[in-house]
Amino acid sequence: MIQVKVFDQEHEKDLEYDMNRFLERLDENKLVDIKYNVAAMPEDDEEEQIYCFSAMVIYRA
């Protein structure tokens, strides 16, 4: 069976940490693919942007 695990963080290092923890427990032969995305949105009434780093790990269960 194919399954997915979705990760979503505001900081790329947090996403990296979470994914590495998950991948440590996953047998390499079960990994199918990893999809990665970054979204940036302006913060209300400020010049800063809010970032959303996300990834989806596709694997065999």
Residues covered by each model-derived region:
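A short acidic, often aromatic-flanked loop/helix-cap motif at beta-alpha or helix-coil junctions
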Residues: E12-L15, A39-M41
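Short amphipathic
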Residues: M1-E10
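Short, mixed-charge low-complexity intrinsically disordered segments
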Residues: E28-Y36, A40
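Residue-level signal for short amphipathic helical patches enriched in basic/charged
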Residues: E10, L26-N29
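C-terminal edge-of-domain segments
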Residues: Q49-A61
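A short, charged, amphipathic alpha-helix used as a generic interaction element across diverse proteins
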Residues: L15-L23, D27
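Short proline/glycine-enriched turn/loop segments at secondary-structure junctions
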Residues: P42-E48
